[in-house]
Amino acid sequence: MGRAELLEGKMSTQDPSDLWSRSDGEAELLQDLGWYHGNLTRHAAEALLLSNGCDGSYLLRDSNETTGLYSLSVRAKDSVKHFHVEYTGYSFKFGFNEFSSLKDFVKHFANQPLIGSETGTLMVLKHPYPRKVEEPSIYESVRVHTAMQTGRTEDDLVPTAPSLGTKEGYLTKQGGLVKTWKTRWFTLHRNELKYFKDQMSPEPIRILDLTECSAVQFDYSQERVNCFCLVFPFRTFYLCAKTGVEADEWIKILRWKLSQIRKQLNQGEGTIRSRSFIFK
């Protein structure tokens, strides 16, 4: 009996969560999967894929939501999207497909599946991101070492980092002077919301600094469906999504961004500079 059949037989008698979370021999096949990253966090997955991945890079990791549920993190053009993978105890569910074994699940990815979400963004899963990457063992020598502050304690040493929280997709935007509606490609990264003429445009039309935004909310004043607005001191931007689900996703992540910005401001963590630039 081959290794795959042996482990497949074990899969039918093991608790579903054990197959994915245990570190002993019962989860050998999963641990041998080079692009399974275990308990890698959502933030770390986004940082890895954005900094060192490319369009179509992906990795599998444990979900922090519930046992038996896992996340496939996928690098799109300027964002990272996350999709659920579920092990039911008898099969693996991903997207519209269900796989009776881990072998079939992995084989599906070997054939570079095409997937799309509510935003309409299509992605080909081409590049599994490895858990282990070779790096040179080179270290720098410390030549200068002094303290820039005095009298501080461990209570003053608070680790901080901005969330990446990326999203991208087409939205229809109302013009500022001429109130016509045009479809633009939007990208959200850190505290910047950029919009471009289309997905292939190298330079944004405008960068909106979300630290200046006071509110994000559904809007019913424009006689359009799936519309929401971003309120800035200098202007209110009206945007429309193709579906209600997509509009809700944008509102949720933008509101979450604003809550994180306010939290940082209230805690006095760093200086956030204003960067609302108009290029054309």
UniProtKB/Swiss-Prot annotation:
GO terms for biological process: protein dephosphorylation; signal transduction. Induction: Upon B-cell activation. The modification Phosphoserine is found at residue 141. Highly expressed in placenta and lung, followed by brain, heart, kidney, liver, pancreas and skeletal muscle. Expressed by B-lymphocytes, but not T-lymphocytes or nonhematopoietic cells. GO terms for cellular component: cytosol; plasma membrane. The keyword Nucleus does not apply. This is Dual adapter for phosphotyrosine and 3-phosphotyrosine and 3-phosphoinositide. Residues 164-259 form the PH domain. Phosphorylated on tyrosine residues. GO terms for molecular function: phosphatidylinositol-3,4,5-trisphosphate binding; phosphatidylinositol-3,4-bisphosphate binding; phospholipid binding. May act as a B-cell-associated adapter that regulates B-cell antigen receptor (BCR)-signaling downstream of PI3K. Its main location: cytoplasm. The modification Phosphotyrosine is found at residue 139. Keywords: Cytoplasm, Membrane, Phosphoprotein, SH2 domain. It is found in: Cytoplasm; Membrane. PROSITE patterns: PH_DOMAIN, SH2. Interacts with PtdIns(3,4,5)P3 and PLCG2. In vitro, interacts with PtdIns(3,4)P2. Residues 1-20 are annotated as: Disordered. It is a peripheral membrane protein. Residues 35-129 form the SH2 domain. It comes from Homo sapiens (Human). InterPro entries: DAPP1_SH2, PH-like_dom_sf, PH_domain, PI-Interact_SigTrans_Reg, SH2, SH2_dom_sf.
